[in-house]
Amino acid sequence: VKADSGSITYDGQELLGKPINKILEAGIAQSPEGRRVFANLTVLENLKIGAYLRKDKDGIEKDLKWVYELFPRLEERSWQLAGTLSGGEQQMLAVGRALMSRPKLMMLDEPSLGLAPLVVQDIFSIIREINRQGVTVLLVEQNANMALKIADLAYVLETGTITMSGTGAELLADSRVKEAYLGKSS
């Protein structure tokens, strides 16, 4: 969807209308909703695609090891075609591929969508670890309870407008959020 007004600025740089390679060079990566892995490529090939703009072979290998530490199942399946992975494994691969660009800001769109509860817990633990490693995470997530538990800052959007903001803990404790998004009355 093309924007018809407004601007997108990151680190003092206008991004609206910039080609994808310039956005990646600015340090931004995205893991879109629906996982979108390259089904006919192996896990390893998918991960290496995430680093396609990088020239530092040693850094790429180091980051590949880091992704495998975060997602040991990906290392076990590195030669398996991505299309044969489970939904949770494909989500791990999509996040891992985005990490291979060595982002400063990682945008995750609905990382828990369609996943089993145990896999969701794993994904959120890993998102927290990614953030601890110095990567800023912008998370769009309908699982408000899980998202707010890991959020430093959080926003409630209603029809495209920010209606509430605060720390994750503040919004978790807010009676309006509990009633509208967490299914609990105050």
Where are the language model's segments positioned?
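Glycine-rich phosphate-binding loops of nucleotide-dependent enzymes
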Residues: 1-186
